[in-house]
Amino acid sequence: TKIADLRSQTTDQLSDELLKLXKEQ
């Protein structure tokens, strides 16, 4: 299902961004 793939992709991207922000601080 494309929707599920998009959701997991978005979640992965958000997790990466959060990790980057956390490391920067």
Curated annotation (Swiss-Prot):
Source domain of life: Bacteria
Record key words, sorted: Ribonucleoprotein, Ribosomal protein
GO cellular-component term (any): ribonucleoprotein complex
Similarity field: Belongs to the universal ribosomal protein uL29 family.
Name of the protein in question: Large ribosomal subunit protein uL29
Species for this entry: Brevundimonas vesicularis (Pseudomonas vesicularis)
Name of the gene encoding the protein in the UniProt record: rpmC
